[in-house]
Amino acid sequence: MGGRFRDRDWPWIQLGQGDAAHPGAYGASMRSMKAILVSFVALVIEHSQAARAEQPVAPMWQLAEAPFQLEVTVLSMEEKPLTERITNIWHRVKVKRVFVGSGLSVGDELAVVSQVFDNPPGATSSSGDRGPFNGPNGLPAKGDHARIFANGSAKVLKTISPNGWQLPDQMIAFIATDDEYRSDVTMPFIAKLIARQGIARTSVHFSTGDDGRGSSAKEPDMKARTGLTDDLGLRRADSSVLAMRRSELGYNQMNSFASVTRHGLPIVGFRNSLQAFGFPGDGEGTKWWNDAFPVETWGTRWRSQCGRQSKTRIVAPDAEARRHPVLSGVSIPAEGLVVPSSLFRVDPLPPDCRVLLWGEAVDGDCPEAERRQPILWVRELPRKSGLPPQRIAFTSLGHPADFLDSEVRLLSIQMIAWAIGEEARMDDAARLTIRTAQYLPPEVQPPATVKP
């Protein structure tokens, strides 16, 4: 099931998500339905083999697609041996924050069961590894604060030790597949600044190829389009930053991508993420990810640019825009700020998008009426079950030389901090650190590594 998506694979992934935004999936052709049945039979065989190999539960990277992501306080813990090598560990927890999930509110108490195996560290089963806490098998103890990624119901959740339990600070997944604008250089730089300011933990996932067995290769390859380094790690993130360009991710990789981008979690985009995917073919799923995903997420799509050699003048924001946390403390002179990014032309934004910065083409070849375009905007989309709105921020800036400017660096960090609700961390000291951070442009930067 690895490799690049084919058209017939798409209805399967859409039906699996159960997303009403994809009505085309429910009118799939007979060819697509046949592929679904074939995939289903393959999954049954796969799971039967796993059962015979005494794999009692699915690995956490599958459960991470389930509908619960919570921040909790542990009230109690109890170990209950199930077999000679399997122990159920029951936690009683109190909900502090609901990121994803229905039927739960802040203050609710519920049970969480985790299975611990006596596998040695590094065994094939993920449960043989240790979690980040000091309890049994790295699980949290009484009084600990933790994040839960779990399946189950609003009364009893089930997860797998230790991957379903994470430290309470947020994790942002940076997805860097834009080879044209060297996201392998710019995104690690931004991710480091985010982590150093204590805004969130970060991971960077680079473009790579397929290992030939349906999984991503381990080493970055920015010319490849079908894989992401540590793509399963996306499922442990609770927000994402995209710097993508025309990716053609495989089936497993798209499952991971959807887990962090299709559940109302915060999402931030740079530059070519207006055209994040470039799947071949004209199937319903192909069209949705290529064309509808950017519109549904960012509110618009890429149309063209005002000349590849042109630049953009960032227009000084008005007083109302300056009061937004994304632009707090950002200094754009009255005459504007010229940056190397060419100006992108986009379709008109919907009313729920709030433009914070406009740009004007410098030495561009756009028609006069289109030489002024939005270059940074935010939106908040409502969510069900009383959850806070999804925060989304996008900028068409992102040329690697843009980040030589301290104000572009600052607004980039503040976009992310606002999206995940951590804008209060951006004080004057933090802004000074970001402005004075050393940035190496691509021409002197070493190649991307898995751990930037």
Across the structure, where does each feature detected by a protein language model lie?
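Solvent-exposed loop/turn segments at secondary-structure junctions
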Residues: 79-80, 98-101, 116-120, 153-155, ...
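Helical hinge/lid and interdomain linker segments adjacent to catalytic or ligand-binding clefts
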Residues: 173-175, 179-277
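Transition segments tied to proteolytic processing and entry into folded domains
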Residues: 49-169
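Tryptophan (W) side chains
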Residues: 10-12
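An acidic, glycine-rich "communication" segment
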Residues: 187, 270-366, 428-452
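Bacterial N-terminal signal peptides
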Residues: 35-47
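Extracellular ligand-binding/catalytic regions of CAZymes and related secreted enzymes
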Residues: 164-165, 169-171, 176, 196, ...
